[in-house]
Design a protein with these regions (language model features):
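Short, structured beta-strand-loop surface elements
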Residues: 41-111
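Short beta-strand segments
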Residues: 5-39, 56
């Protein structure tokens, strides 16, 4: 089902405000996790939020998750970075940016 879906909705906690911040962004699924790419790399507020507090909530279709986000280091994990870039290129014809992994730790029954 995730092959058909175009967007994931990711909620981070604002590192300055402490308020929830939700984005809509392209994604790919790989090996039980979800991956998104920040076009603006470290300048994206949501990346800064994840760097400071990796606890996230996210929605893929009608599935809601609590989990953790982390930036993928392409130097330390070249195979993972290459796989994610290939999937993004195949799905969206674009993969230029900072890769962030969304690791679902629990699914929220009933969507929230």
């Amino acid at each position: 089902m995730t092959e058909e879906l175009q967007y994931v909705y990711v909620t981070t906690t604002g590192w300055k405000s402490g308020n929830p911040h939700t984005i809509e962004i392209w994604f790919v699924a790989y090996d039980g996790r979800y991956y998104i790419v920040s076009e603006h790399r470290e300048r994206s507020h949501w990346v800064q939020n994840i760097r400071r507090n990796p606890a996230i909530a996210f929605r893929v279709g009608d599935r809601h998750f609590q989990g953790r986000g982390r930036v993928v280091d392409p130097t330390a994990e070249p195979e993972l970075a290459a796989a994610v870039c290939a999937l993004m290129d195949a799905k969206y014809d674009w993969s230029d940016g900072l890769i962030v992994e969304l690791h679902p730790e629990s699914e929220i029954a009933g969507g929230g």
